[in-house]
Amino acid sequence: MSKPAPKFLTLTAENVTVRLSKPTTLNGVDQATITLRAPTVKDIRSAGQTSDGDDAQREMNLFASLADIGVKDLEGLTYKDYNRVATGYNFLVQDDEL
């Protein structure tokens, strides 16, 4: 049985929207949420190929690609909000049937 999603997440089969603890600037616009689309195999492979074996950089590249924002925007998040994004990603890719 899977754990229920936290209240700061809005989850669909196609994406997850993460409510940030405070608004932040993403692509030059103040935003209170970040939406990540579901990844493809190509997304996963591309993130790995551009990270030079650095797992943290691979994750940043992947999240930035899925949210259509710059890596620098992700790096500007508070650690609490980055953890919310990572949690959202984990719920998004979780297989409910397992």
Annotate each language-model stretch with its function.
Residues 2-98:
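Short, surface-exposed, charged amphipathic helix/loop patches that serve as local interaction elements
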